[in-house]
Amino acid sequence: MQKGGAVMRYFDYSFLNNGLLPANLVNLTANIAELKTMAGVRKEEYIQIFTELEAVAKVQSIKSSNAIEGIVTSDERIAEIVNQNSAPLNHNEAEIAGYRDALNEIHLGYEHIDFREADILRLHEILMQFTGNGIGGQYKTDDNVILEIDAEGRRKVRFHPTSALETPEAMEQLTLAYMDARSDANINQLLLIPCVILDFLCIHPFRDGNGRMSRLLSLLLLYKNGFDAGKYVSFEEQINNYKVYYYESLRKSSIDWEKNENSY
């Protein structure tokens, strides 16, 4: 597809159903599905332990997902914001409190939230509600770039996301492509979800909060497909602990994305 002479990004996940997936990925998803079944039994046997794990993971998730973006405060304040709904005292805490509420929204109501534009915009509005910048729940109005900093501290452009003008159409096409793919019984959801989230990050639809939204949406889609380990072991903390590898994987997976030639 072309527009104004430029190649337009399209979204098609049918390659996940072509039978050519690496054996290690197929085996990994099978192992995860088996562990999910075992965890379901254990949750019924050890209710108190899982309740305590959920409380700890919630604090770790909110702390880590924000820390990845350089948004930090003291551990004491994190605990107060998460466990006592303490009002934010500064901009960083406003960002953290917004993530708390967005994560709570997913934990408590994921069955009623979907990967559709209205719900994505609503989650972003919740995420940004305390910042006072007026951009919550709205797609970007100016083009943005993804920067990286080299060992000498020099900034350079790593990636040019979708333009602001093309973002609404790209998000519509992304959500429709996901809905189409999830209805295909031959497409493994554990492989579909990271592909969709990568595309979301490459669109970079918001002026701020794209990274944190990607992690919230990852949890949402995993929960909706019955994979709720992120409630008990912080998914965001794992990314923060290995963020060098995480960002390198994003870089490799997005090479030639704008040409529809990335390999995921």
Feature roles, as predicted:
Residues M1-Y264:
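FIC/Doc superfamily catalytic core
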